[in-house]
Amino acid sequence: MTATRAPRAARGRVPLDQRGFDFSRPDDIVCGVDEAGRGPLAGPVVAAAVILDPAQPIEGLDDSKALSAKKRDALYDLIVARSRAYCVASASVDEIDTLNILHATMLAMKRAVEGLSLMPTLAQIDGNRCPTLMVRAEAIVSGDALVPSISAASILAKVTRDRMLVELHARHPVYGFDVHAGYGTAKHLAALREHGPCEAHRRSFAPVRAALDLIR
């Protein structure tokens, strides 16, 4: 595993013994990997892995958070249609509560890479940590804004998770999952206090535990 350094403003914590290495090779099959949903109080964490096709470039790829919902949806369709391979995977709320959110995120990323129909030789991961994989892995801080395949993965993960939360909203409309995607907005926290958590809430997260205490 290695970590590539982004420009100074984008740097995060990277272990000293992982800086300055570059394991890429000219003949590598590279997949980009990113996640969506580490911070929310409800719903799964979703990860995606994407191997882009250089013969079918996709214009406009960027960090999913920097794009409008309409632009993300349009790029989602292009990524699915033009990529050499892609896979979207997740870790459940139960897995998040059992493992903790970091390890559940690594699990979702591992599932996404291992679910690709084409085996990569190098996985480039957004952030400063890599899951344990059967292929070489490189962590890239702010990779979702720097590496097109990671940008593509961030879009697939974000769009997929947002759609999951819209479906969850249909079952539990009192929380407003279709608006905040499970994040701890003021309205979401107020609904938690009033109604208590549903089965999709992460009980290992402090605001959810606090809401549980109120109804006991």
UniProtKB/Swiss-Prot annotation:
Needed cofactors: Mn(2+); Mg(2+)
EC supergroup of this enzyme: hydrolase
PROSITE patterns documented for this protein: RNASE_H_2
Domain RNase H type-2: 28-216
Superkingdom assignment: Bacteria
Record's cofactor remark: Manganese or magnesium. Binds 1 divalent metal ion per monomer in the absence of substrate. May bind a second metal ion after substrate binding.
Keywords, alphabetical: Cytoplasm, Endonuclease, Hydrolase, Manganese, Metal-binding, Nuclease
Family annotation (CDD domains): RNase_HII_bacteria_HII_like
One Gene Ontology term, aspect cellular component: ribonuclease H2 complex
One BP annotation, GO: mismatch repair
Enzyme Commission number, as recorded: 3.1.26.4
Signal sequence annotation: none
InterPro entries for the chain: RNase_HII (IPR022898), RNase_HII/HIII (IPR001352), RNase_HII/HIII_dom (IPR024567), RNaseH-like_sf (IPR012337), RNaseH_sf (IPR036397)
Chain residues that bind a divalent metal cation: 34-35, 126
Pfam families membership: RNase_HII
One MF term in the entry's GO annotations: RNA binding
Primary site of residence: cytoplasm
Transmembrane segments: none
Protein family per UniProt: Belongs to the RNase HII family.
NCBIfam families in the cross-refs: PRK00015.1-3 (NF000595), PRK00015.1-4 (NF000596)
Listed HAMAP family: RNase_HII_B
Annotated function: Endonuclease that specifically degrades the RNA of RNA-DNA hybrids.
Record's protein name: Ribonuclease HII
Naturally occurring in which organism (per UniProt): Burkholderia vietnamiensis (strain G4 / LMG 22486)
Gene (UniProt): rnhB
